[in-house]
Amino acid sequence: MWRIPVIVALVAGLLYWVRKQGSQPSRKIPQPRIGLPVVGDAHAFGKSPISYIRQATARCGPVFQINLLLTKIVMLRGAQLNRFYLDTREEVWSFGDGMGLFLEKVVVPGYLSHLKEMVSSLNRGVIRSIALEHYTRIAGEEARKIATNWAEKPDIEVFEQMSRYTHRVIVRCLMGQDFYDHHLDELLDLLHRMEADIGHPFHFLLPNWVPHGPARRLHHARDRMAAIFNERLQAREQNPEKWQDSLDYIAYTLKDSRTAHLRQYFAAHHTLLMFAAHTSTVASIAWTVLELLRNPTHLEALKTALATDADIHRSPTLIATLKETSRRYSGVNMIRWARQPHQLPADAAPGKGNIVVPENCIVSISPYLTHHDPETYADPHIWDPTRWLEGGRLSETQKSNRSEVTYFPFGAGCHRCPGEQMAGMIAREMVAHMVKTYDVRWSSTGPPEDFEQLDFSRVGSAWLKGDARVTVKRDKQGMEEA
C-alpha cells in the first residue's frame, strides 16, 4: 500500500517543479504568457507557431522566451539578430545538438558525436563536379520517367508525387543503385512513418526515459534502416569491383579515410539526409507548380524563357521562380541548442538592457517570418518571381549583408546547408521538364479552397494540408519538340 502515496507524492512533486520552473523566467528575457498559466505558451505555439510568434513579438519585442514545460525556446526576431544567430560559433549555440532534439530517436547513439565529420564529407562528396553532373543526369531521367507515369493517370496529388520523385533521386544519388533496386519503396515508407512521429509533442514534454508510442515507432524505424544498410554494405563487400567506380555518396564515404571507419553510422547519417533533403525540396517543387497554375502570366514568362535558355540550371527566370517559392514557403524556424551562456548585442532589445541567453535552452530564428517582413519584401504574401529579377538578370537588391540576413532558406555563411546545390538541381530538373513538356491543370475537383493551410509538422518547409490534385498531360508543343 505504501507505493500509492509515494507515487502520488512523486507526481505532485514533479507537477510542483514544472510549475515552479514555468513561473521563474530568466530575469532579462520577457515571456509572452499567452493563454493558460504554465501550459498556455506551449499549447499556443504548438497549435499555430506563425500566429503565436507574431503575437509574442508584438507583446514582448524582438527577444522573448517560450516555455515548453521541460525546456524553453529563446526566440530572436529581426534581420540583425538573424545575422548574430548565424554567425555564432557552433561550440556556443549548436546546430548539431538542435537537430539531435528531433533526431536522437531515429539515429544510433554516438552518431551525433561524429556529425561534423559526416557533414564535412557531404560537402566534399556531393559537390564534386563529376558527381553533380552524374546526379543531374539521374534527376533528369527520374523526372522524365515519373512524369510519363503521371500522364497516364486521371490526376495526381502534387506533394505526394513530388515526394516520390525527390525520394527516387535522393536514393539513387546518395545511397546508390542497389538501395534503389532493392529498398526504394520501403525507404520512402520508413521516411513517411518517421515524419509522422518525429515532431510529436511527447518528445518535448516527456523525459527520454519515459516510454511512449511515437518513440517506440521511431526506434523500430531506426532499427530497420540499420538492417537495410547492413544488408547492402555486406553485399558490396562481396563484390567490390562492381562499386569501385560508383559515384553515389555511400561509395565516396566508404573510400574516404576520414569516414570509412564510421560505417556503423551510415544508416543514421542517411536518415538525417533524407529528412534534410526531402521535405524542403518537395515543398520547393510542389509549391512552384501550384503557384504557376495560380499565376498564368508567370507561367508563360517561364515557358518563354526556358524555350531559349540553353542551360536550365543557369536560367535567371527559373532560378528566380524557385527562389521566390523558397521565400514564400520556407520553414517556420531554425533551432540551435545553447551550450554556453551568450550575451546578445547591446541593442538587441531596446529598453531591456543587456540580455544573456542562458545555457541548456533552444535558441531559434524564423526564416518564414523574416521572409514575410513587409519592411524587406513588398507585398510579402504575394508570390512574385520578378522581385528577384532586374533587366532579365538575377537582382542583388534582396541580398543579405554583413550586418543583416533577410533571406536564408538554406541558412547562411558558415552555416549554409551543404545540400543546397543538389536540392536546387533536383527542383530545376523537375520544374523545367513539367513547364516545357506538359500541360498541367487543376483536376476536376478544382484548386484547394485555402492555400494558407500550411503544414509545418515536418522538419523543413511547409507543405499544403490536404495536398492538391492536378492533371498532367503531354503538351502538343512538348510532343513536337520531343
Curated annotation (Swiss-Prot):
InterPro entries: CYP450_sterol_14alpha_dmase, Cyt_P450, Cyt_P450_CS, Cyt_P450_E_grp-IV, Cyt_P450_sf. Belongs to the cytochrome P450 family. This is Cytochrome P450 monooxygenase pynD. It comes from Aspergillus niger (strain ATCC MYA-4892 / CBS 513.88 / FGSC A1513). Pathway: Secondary metabolite biosynthesis. Heme binds at residue 417. One of its GO terms (biological process) is secondary metabolic process. GO terms for molecular function: heme binding; iron ion binding; monooxygenase activity; oxidoreductase activity, acting on paired donors, with incorporation or reduction of molecular oxygen.
